[in-house]
From Swiss-Prot:
It catalyses: [pyruvate, water dikinase] + ADP = [pyruvate, water dikinase]-phosphate + AMP + H(+); [pyruvate, water dikinase]-phosphate + phosphate + H(+) = [pyruvate, water dikinase] + diphosphate. Keywords: Kinase, Nucleotide-binding, Serine/threonine-protein kinase, Transferase. Pfam families: Kinase-PPPase. InterPro entries: Kinase-pyrophosphorylase, PSRP. Bifunctional serine/threonine kinase and phosphorylase involved in the regulation of the phosphoenolpyruvate synthase (PEPS) by catalyzing its phosphorylation/dephosphorylation. ADP binds at residues 150-157. One of its GO terms (molecular function) is ATP binding. Transmembrane segments: none annotated. Its EC number is 2.7.11.33, 2.7.4.28. It comes from the Bacteria. This is Putative phosphoenolpyruvate synthase regulatory protein. Belongs to the pyruvate, phosphate/water dikinase regulatory protein family. PSRP subfamily.
Amino acid sequence: MARKVFYISDGTAITAEVFGHAVLSQFPMEFEAITIPFVETNAKAEAVKKQINDSFITTGERPLVFHSIVKPEIRDVIYSSEGLDYDFLNTFVAPLEQQLGVSAAPVLHRTHGKANHSYEARIDAINFAMENDDGQTLKHMDKADIILLGVSRCGKTPSSLYLSMQFGIKAANYPFTEDDMDSLKLPEALKRNKHKLFGLTIDPVRLQEIRQSRMENSRYSSLRQCRMEVKEVEMMFKKERIPYIDTTNHSVEEIATKILDMTGMERHMF
């Protein structure tokens, strides 16, 4: 049976989720996650406490509880549950207060709220990634921070969206399709922005598996076609001196981190 995990916050619970996922990913076992944001009143906290306690009674195992709760009175209710508490704010804030010699001034929703100065940049970047996904248009390439290239289904779209959502980076992406293979070359708008180009490639066998789930038993998803497209696009990357990475067996977080590391791009937000 999967171990029950709760991610709780009086805000969005994004911080608790990121913190918890980072820790639990180190353990080779299954977890059943429940995320509960906006626990802003004692009544809501008591309801969450009951949910945690019910889980303990049902499973016989104390649930893992990752939380980032600003209000002390809400936090105390969660502390009194049968869960095993992992408090992000108290774990790191108290030692920092000692080192910095300054008391923290917690503000609810500050981390991910609209008041954050990077909010507008994040929204602009997300909109840009969606409008410039999969080569829909080449009109805005001059405004892109980075342009991801690769064959269809190699991870361009999720990587673009992750870069925009997590770091506020305006990421466009452009696919090379079967129709491009006879005379594979960069469109003029991409040539003009060659310093922004970054390639993604993938193992042909893995690519076939992904394409089969979308268009089973088609030419598009045949191993022969996948091998040919990957080979041609990698040759073009080398010819044009476009840096690229293999996305096979890498998560979108790892892909994005490798892109940032190799390009030296500045993260617009943290």
